[in-house]
Structure formats: C-alpha cells, structure tokens
C-alpha cells in the first residue's frame, strides 16, 4: 500500500519521547541489564528503521518478529545485535547467518528437520526459547533444553542466549506470573550449559516486576509511551505517547433534521447540524467499530456519526470550522487528549492493536528534536 502524502492524514512520531521512555525504564532496572528494543511490526506502527536509528546508542540491540524485519534494519545500515523472536524456516537459516542475525530455536523437531536437510549451522548465533506457560513456541523441560543446546553446539552453532515470555505480567494477579518465573528459573539452574544472555522481561515485567529482571529486558509497548495493561494497572512513572494521528476537515456542510449520513443511513440528524468530513477510514486502520467514538477539533470532542468508510469519516461539529482545520484522532488538542488506549477501550481491544493497525497509507513524519 502506497503512502498517501497528498492528503492531510499523517502520523507524527516524536522520537525524543521514545528516547525518554527508554531512559525511564532503564532508571528502574539493574544497570547491568541489557536493553533490547522491540521494533517488530514496523516498531508497533512507528517506523522500524527511523526508531532504531534514533535509539541505536541507547540500547544493546533490537528484537523483530521475522527475517524480513531483520533484513530491513540491516539494509538501512544498522549493524547492531538483532534477535528474531519468531521461528525461521530451515531454508532461511543461511541468510540469517550471512547477515549476522541471531535466530530463535524453539524445539527439537525444528533442529531435527534442519539436520535432516543438512543445513549448515556452523557460526549461527542462537537464542533458545523456553515455553514457561505461554503455550506458544519453546521447549518445555530442562531435558529438552539441554538436549537442544547440546545438539546446536555440536552442529557448530553458538548458543548466546535463552529466554521466555510471560503471559500475565500486565495483570494484577501474580499467580500465573509466579508459576512461569519459577519454571524458568528452575530450568536455568539445571542447565548443563548456561548461555550468556538470559532474558524474560517484556515491558510489563520491566515495569511491575523489575526485581525479577535477569540480565536483559525486551522493551516493546512502553517504549512507545503506552501502558502495557491498558488502564488495568497504574504506571509507577511517567511515559510519553510517541505517536499522534491527525487529519483535517475537507468539507463542512449543514444537514437538516431527518437527513441521514453515511453507508446504511445509520445516522439521522435530529435537528440542523454541522457535519465535517475527514479523509481517514478503515483502510488507514481507523476501523468501522469507531462509529460513535470521537475526535478532537479545536479542543472540542466531536462525535463520529455515520459509518466509518474505507477512506472517510463524518463528524458532528459544534460550529462551521474552516476547511483545513486540524482534526486529532490520537493525541492532544488544547486541554483534551485522545490516547491509543482510549481508542482501544472503545474497540474492546488493546492499545498495541490500535497502533499496529495504522496502515502504510498513513505517512509517518518524525519530530527529530531530542530533549
């Protein structure tokens, strides 16, 4: 999807806020702990290359989801440590090794398949994934971990790290978290060979369970200034949302009582009303279930009336504003703010999804001033 620069809908990313957020977390974890910045999914919609370049000196490496995301960073000239968190196909190993990209190995079946296909692992950098209770990828016992590490080393791979992922670190109850932590720490203590880097802390763990940080953290959503729990848990320190989503009024008209607006004629004006049209829609990630939500115009909340279309929304205005007047979908206008978490609550989802769904059609612009 091509970025649409010739319309007013834009995502502005404040790189200085991302740097600030990283510093906030780093101040509250052990100084010896490495920081891996998670820039998968285009840095949660913020722009992977631009974010990585801005924070390169602040972190110890980057985490991505797949080989293509890792190659994007390499092709942009970023030669830092990169860990692919997902599982690679065996035929992708050679390219990862060539580009000095660390891969995740998550079970013996994958290793056996690689061996059967005679894929050369010599010189490959590996982190082993442990499934401590998430139920996705990873080894589930000390015996399996020991066998996998020994096999990888015999094949010439370098096992530099081992890690797990917590399912409920962003929840008030710590029962499941404690079970996972105990499983992982017990497994680590029983390894025949302990890799140098041991990491389990995602954003939520780094914030609310900082005393359990091992020797590295993986910072994702908090780096972009959002609460991993939504609003379920209070943040112990300030972080600043890094992304603003704005557009502008392209038409303003008066409709009369009884007039309908949008597909399906789902909205009927109860009296004479001023309706503004904004060029943003579900193709941009502003989804159809946001009908009835609001945006900000000149510091005023304005309801989205009628269905969200592919390319446009219609909003009820308190008065007839000039064409080109700024419309804030995510961000601050005057004394009022709409956060990605607010949008998520309306959609009954999580703030991660709201950011990741902002499509490539929305140009990203960058405020590069650093405070």
UniProtKB/Swiss-Prot annotation:
Binding site for substrate: 136, 310
Active site: 40 (proton acceptor), 263 (proton acceptor)
Keywords: Isomerase, Pyridoxal phosphate
Matches recorded under SUPFAM superfamilies: Alanine racemase C-terminal domain-like, PLP-binding barrel
Pathway(s) the chain acts in: Amino-acid biosynthesis; D-alanine biosynthesis; D-alanine from L-alanine: step 1/1
Coiled coil, from the record: none
Catalytic activity: L-alanine = D-alanine
EC number(s) given by UniProt: 5.1.1.1
PROSITE patterns: ALANINE_RACEMASE (PS00395)
One Gene Ontology term of the molecular function aspect: pyridoxal phosphate binding
A biological process term (GO) from this entry: peptidoglycan biosynthetic process
Record-linked Pfam families: Ala_racemase_C (PF00842), Ala_racemase_N (PF01168)
Role, per record: Catalyzes the interconversion of L-alanine and D-alanine. May also act on other amino acids.
Protein name: Alanine racemase
Organism: Streptococcus mutans serotype c (strain ATCC 700610 / UA159)
């Amino acid at each position: 999807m091509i970025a649409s620069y010739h319309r007013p809908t834009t995502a502005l990313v404040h790189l200085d806020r991302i740097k600030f957020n990283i510093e906030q977390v780093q101040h509250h974890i052990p100084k010896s702990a490495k920081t891996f910045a998670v820039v998968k999914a285009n840095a949660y919609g913020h722009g992977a290359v631009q974010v990585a370049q801005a924070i390169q000196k602040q972190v110890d490496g980057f985490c991505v989801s797949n080989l293509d995301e890792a190659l994007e960073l390499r092709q942009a000239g970023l030669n830092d440590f990169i860990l692919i968190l997902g599982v690679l196909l065996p035929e992708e190993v050679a390219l990862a090794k060539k580009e000095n990209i660390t891969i995740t190995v998550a079970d013996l079946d994958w290793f056996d398949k690689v061996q059967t296909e005679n894929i050369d692992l010599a010189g490959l950098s590996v982190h082993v994934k442990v499934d401590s209770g998430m139920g996705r990828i990873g080894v589930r016992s000390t015996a399996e971990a020991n066998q996998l590490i020994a096999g990888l080393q015999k094949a010439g791979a370098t096992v530099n790290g081992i890690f797990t992922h917590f399912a409920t670190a962003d929840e008030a109850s710590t029962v499941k978290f404690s079970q996972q932590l105990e499983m992982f720490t017990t497994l680590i203590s029983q390894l025949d060979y302990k890799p140098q880097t041991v990491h389990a802390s995602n954003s939520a763990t780094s914030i609310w369970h900082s005393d359990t940080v091992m020797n590295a953290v993986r910072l994702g959503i908090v780096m972009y200034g959002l609460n991993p729990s939504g609003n379920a848990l209070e943040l112990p320190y300030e972080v600043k949302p890094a992304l603003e989503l704005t557009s502008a009024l392209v038409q303003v008209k008066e409709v009369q009582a009884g007039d309908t607006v949008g597909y399906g004629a789902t909205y009927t004006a109860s009296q004479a009303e001023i309706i503004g049209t904004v060029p943003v829609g579900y193709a941009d990630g502003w989804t159809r279930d946001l009908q009835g939500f609001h945006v900000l115009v000149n510091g005023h909340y304005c309801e989205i009336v009628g269905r969200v279309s592919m390319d446009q929304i219609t909003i009820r205005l308190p008065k007839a504003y000039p064409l080109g007047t700024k419309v804030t979908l995510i961000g601050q206008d005057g004394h009022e703010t709409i956060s990605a978490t607010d949008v998520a609550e309306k959609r009954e989802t999580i703030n991660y999804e709201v950011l990741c769904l902002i499509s490539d059609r929305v140009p990203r612009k960058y405020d590069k001033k650093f405070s």
